Amino acid sequence: MRIPLRVVTVTTAVCLALGGTTACSPADRAVLFASACSDSTAFPTAPRHEPGQAHLIGQVIRSGLPMGPVPGWDDVVSVADAGTTLAAVHAGGTVSVVGVDHDGLLAGTAGGAGQTLLPRRVPGVSDAISVAAVGSAFLITHADGTVSGWGDSFIASGGLRGDSPVRTTPAAVQGVDEVVSVADGSLSALALRSDGGVLGWGVNLTEILGEPPGTTVRRIRDVPGAVSVSDASGAAVIATATGEVCAWGNNVHGLLGVEPRGGQTNRPVRVDGFGDAEVVQVAGGQHFALALDSAGTVWTWGRTVTGILGDGTTDDTVLSSPRPVPGLPPLRWVGASESSPYGIDGAGALWSWGRGPVRSPEPARDTRPRRVPLPGPAQTVTGALVLLAPGD
């Protein structure tokens, strides 16, 4: 059988060289012949939120920042949680940070202090529309579609390995433009462009950045028109304009929807199992993925040990076929941070299942869906930080 050149990944190239597909493992063959995604065209726009209060529902690592409303963050349109440090974009386009100065995440605002309990403005930023946390770096998307970063210099500089491991001043990520949003992540950055393409940089051991091998900024090849992009720890998962879900990277946790598990690929493959559902948004956590369809149903797959199934079980198994999460009302948004899945319904109520809110002082005893108490409707969640809707 002749295999198109664009289908051949580094892993499969090795086994093909050793003797054709019969020399490949069953997992490699399964990924090699997985269904391709349908061609589509998309023109996603930047997510917009009303200026509201940022509210902390979990603990900030190594910080004395109390849970509840973050002082000075009552006009916020985007938030990001890097574990030790929080960042927010204000309605006027400025950015401020609070927490611990790990890897320069306070952007030089702490004046040598190890942490701050009051937000401090990040210098040199006046036109931000959103912020994301990728490992120990913050990446902001500007109104003109460019991206700047600070913190861990490997991510903040676009996958370049410089002389200093830390960047304390925001600077442009070269080669990145026309971006509408950047996905939260850990080892790699994934940025959604206004033409439905995806840019990536960072660690590429699982081929999450596609071809060629390397760590620097590139447009990931053969991605159909994407409307939503997420990082599920070693695999990228997208929703396309046709309502399909596609994924690439590592399949050890079944995130590519292929059996037997294992293998990896740098080409997007279609994740089947959604029936007639039209998926409009995706989210990625620690080795699991979520998909929201147009009817408000949430689907999940991947490693199940954290209770992502929402049925009360926490068996350490892997689900490669998406399954609806029971016990939830129709949702309008889904998100995931580390081992915690989240959802927001039409009234703004925040739902969580699995192990519960990130870094909560009281981990959930029951992994079934439950409402998270909040002083007002939620617009979005990142880590342990909720952006509330404006009050009446």
Where in the sequence are the language-model features?
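Eukaryote-biased RCC1-like beta-propeller repeat architecture
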Residues: 4-12, 17-392
